[in-house]
Amino acid sequence: MEKKAKMSNKTFKRVWITVLSLVLVLAVAVNIAISIFESYVNNYLGYGTYEIIENPNTSDWDSQYYKLDYDNANGALNAALAMSERVEAEGIVLMKNAGVLPLQSGASVTMLGRDAADSVYGGSGSGSVDIDTAVTARHGMENAGFRVNQTVYDILSAYASSNAKADIVMDNPSASSYYIGEMPVSGYTGNAVASFAQYNDAAVVYIGRGGGEGGDLTCDMQGWDSNYTQGQHQLELNKDEKDMIALAKQHFDKVVVIINSSNAMELGELENDPGVDAILWVGSPGQVGFNAVGQVLSGGVNPSGRTADIYPADFTKDPTFVNFGDYAYSNINGGYFVHYEEGIYYGYRYYETAAAEGFINYDEAVVYPFGHGLSYTDFSWSIAGQRLGDVDGDIEIDVTVTNTGSVAGKDVVQLYYSAPYTKGGIEKSQVVLGAFAKTKLLNAGESETVTLKMAVEDMASYDYKNAKAYVLEKGVYQLLIQNDSHNLKDDISAISYDVSATVTYKDGRSGDKIPVTNQFDDVNVLFTDSKQDGYITDFSRADFAGTFPTAPTAADMLATEAVVAGFVPYNAAAVNAESDVDMPATGIQSGLSLIDLRGLDYDDPLWEVFLDQLTIDDMLTVTLNGAYHTEVLKSIGKPATTELDGPAGFTSFMGNINCTSYPSAVVMASTFNAELMYEMGEVLGNEALANKINGWYAPGMNNHRSPFAGRNFEYYSEDPVLSGIIGEACVSGLASKGVYAFIKHYAVNDQETNRVNNGVAAWVNEQALREIYLRPFEITIKSASSEMHYFSDEEGTVFTKNIGATAVMSSFNRIGAVWAGGSYPLMTTVLRDEWGFEGYVITDFNLYDFMVPDQGVYAGSDLTLTFTPMKSMQDATSAASVTNMRNAMHNILYTTANSNAMNGLVSGAQIIRHTPTWRFVQIGADIAIGLFLIAGVLWVVIRTRRYKDEVANV
């Protein structure tokens, strides 16, 4: 047998040197990448554990400032699941009922519609829900005792698995799709139709629409629907859905429609169809919410939700319709914008006012008012008392609610006010929600008295043109106890409140820390009273027809010189050169630890001594590396913190911690139950404690300006008062467990289109800005409160104090031409100076050039939501820059000190950080690779010499 030829030295060395070189280069590259993106790796694989070395003199102090209310993490999880179902149960809105609901328990039903098998649970992006662990629509029905038609369900499931429906791809409209995806009625085969007879107690028809981060729903379905009709949009029923409704009416005596959407839809056709017996809105139910849907259908739960948005008959006639979407200046590269031409007149504020002025026929224009919702029982109301304070006081109205029906239920009482309006004067809506209250569960015949309370000054309007202040004009204000935004409760007359003299709040209102006046004249200047090329017309009640919003013209798309200048990138050197501040002290150790500052006032002098300890590197380490965490600073006893995203619970698509997925924020708002939202905040706080979470990138406080906005599922409502009260309750509940909630996105982040394309410029006049878009944030900042505990002497005495909201997230968009996160008037003057906010602001995800960290810390955005080294400071050494970073650190550290991040820490304790497990794996891999390389080199040397010897001996 011929002996196989041995590889030559030349070939052998070429092969092995190449292999060893590639391994070496790859190993070095991976280690360099890990070093650069260490914070990103930490976010996914873990930051490592921390050990607290107690001060022996304080070993008997109870430093668990916030305690888990359950025995273990499983207890917290089970409580969260129960709360999630409870929120859905109270948020479901019975829109229509011709006496068919509730269905009989144990009824045999047929579920129709793709959405029955392919439901909407949340939204895409940060609002996604793990559907593998979710209770499905079918399971919810079966858990409530219904028998479900298996034949039809299997057909729907198979169709859904092989046919596309709408899919919003984050910040990539070209990759997104907008198919309704409903199965044509031809898909209901002969066998399917034959099966109806065995499951004919009711047809339950599911209609679904989903939203998502980074994209809006489409206002024109051309190209996305094979049966497209001119002007068809995504939020109306398409032909396949209408055919399905017709099929249900043909074969079933009872037809119930489930609206599985957090975006309002055009439902007039269903409401006016006598063959559709009931309509139930369920929003996006989250992880277990479909259990509650089944319970409402069976009568186990009496629905008590109310619509958080108005439901117009024709969205294309809405004043926001033409000014939503993709518009850009022709003379600015990346100059995208949106005109809020409607001002304060959007949602129910427009429809109620336009009807009062005779501009529209309300019954034709509106399907369901804001605040609408039916029940399985009846209620009567009566005024039990009223206390009408003076203009510096409060209005309180007591209403006794009695269940006059035969089953237990809850009711919602709504207080609106109608302010006197002078044609051509300050713009005013015909009605505005002032307060609301929800009863407890009232048994048949049972009564409860609820109190509706609001400050008189809350009825003031903001006059951005003349007084440049809030103004409570003289005249008679009507206080209206209503079922919804349109209908007075039977037998309850309006209450008159007389303001004898106009009050102009030049010194601010009672809740303002400084006088309030115009801060956004660079935006206001673009608004005019009549139509002019290049300007925005104020939509006025004085002439709805003549000032009705129109789409931007070519002239409007030519930016003025001032607007062009506003888009010029931030120049830190130029701005800082104008500053005359002195270089602050750095690196001066005083022995203080962060725990020593817990409980101290924000402006306590000890903070300055403490901050003197920081080095510039400390400041850069924290402020430029804030994605989903803040960094540990052992030198000052600052622990690392963990912050998670997810608008409906800690369910972020970034990181490896996932908790309960709650129903969408719209469902939360639709409960009209602030007490429930506080309890939900407490339960969320327990989940946070069980999972070592310190902060939450939520709740979302933006408004439903347009039903087409992709992130409406993340935001509560069109109404700022409802949003503010619901949000404040949730924030306070979370704070009771030491969790700081980042109310977001501050501010005017009401569409997704072009959000990251250099920041879409939102042009909104200051009246609408303050009364509508800033109002939910203002209510939460001024009202949120929770008791905290701390030690303040050497004896271990426990002190308590109240602390408010301590975290805010800014937004991608611009206010006018200025990036919101870099707007000093927005981030400092309004937020901190006027409202008194104490805490820190984090940017939205900071990957884009227009979001400059220097501009952020100058304006009051303290932490950059990004991973090192994605962003850097233009100027990190000047006195102005260091002062700005020091202020940012003050804000960040104040929030941290007064949070659950300090659990286990007392004065004198030390923090030891343990290396994360993944780092040991990396070290082990490096050692193994190193040994392999050494062995490889030795083998090459040995083999080469041996081969030479063999050749020499031949």
Residue ranges and their predicted role:
Residues 1-464, 473-487, 511-954:
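Glycoside hydrolase catalytic-domain context in secreted enzymes
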Residues 468:
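Extracellular/periplasmic metallocenter environments
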Residues 488-511:
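Short beta-strand elements
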